[in-house]
Amino acid sequence: MLTGFATSTGTARYRDRFPELRDAGHFRRPANVPGAGELWLSSIGLGTYLGDADAATDTAYTESIASALRSGINVLDTAINYRHQRSERNIGAALQQLVASRELNRDEILV
């Protein structure tokens, strides 16, 4: 299991990996979210609520999550009840894949 959480240093590192998005104001520090004001977060996130609880949807979710993370989205929304916990597992699989390939670090992503 991958451990860790988003940090100010990590999210700034992620933001700086996308200079065109950074310069366009895509990354922001949320002013009204307790505990998140030091994080650099993408202006859009990826939600994981809908979809069938099956292997085909799991594969599509994992690929979509990895694509989003490679494209400048570092905010992922999930909960234990989304797709019977499968969405959380798909996020974990995508994160593990990208961390293992050294494409990103866990501290760059807000889940």
Set out the residue ranges of the language-model regions.
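N-terminal binding-site loop/beta-alpha segment at the start of enzyme catalytic domains
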Residues: 1-110
